[in-house]
Amino acid sequence: MAFDYKKEYKEFYMPKGTPSIVTVPKMNYIAVRGSGNPNDADGEYKQAIGLLYGIAFTIKMSKKEDHQIDGYFDYVVPPLEGFWWQEGVSGIDYARKEDFKWISVIRLPDFVSREDFDWAIRKATEKKNQDFSKVEFFSYDEGLCVQCMHIGAYDDEPATVYAMHRFMEEQGYTLDITDQRMHHEIYLSDVRKVAPEKLKTVIRHPIKRA
């Protein structure tokens, strides 16, 4: 059985539909930075997703290549995630999607070193004849957060965010969104195959003691 991060780390990928407090450890990611409306058909975001999965599957299938990754075990590629912000806005203004700045990411297994990552960039570039220069090795220590499973359309997220913030305050915490700590989403559903009202998205916000 391939190792599935969603199932092995349910506290990070499968929270309940009610808010909870969690401390997220440092993780490494495949990452692409960009800006603009994620719904644009030919926008940066759609291109970024293609780049991310190109590297993610190159690493996953490295077991069939000459480059052998030390400590490799078979695994399910983790879900797509995104860190989002807007200049001059505290939190997210869903009515201004064209102003989004984002870092789109896919988690890397801990056994993937920076050298393995660099190999994957070279391999994918050669095999797919495509430019992967925007893809980076990204380490992030998220720390203390409030999170909740949001079920429904992305535009309906504000209601879940409101419940998260109310719970956070009741527990003695305050929001800690900064230039380094951002609105975070983990996408558990394939938007191409799942109806908007059934989409599952983990929403996570950084917090600190009030």
What is the role of each PLM region?
Residues M1-A210:
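A solvent-exposed interaction/effector surface
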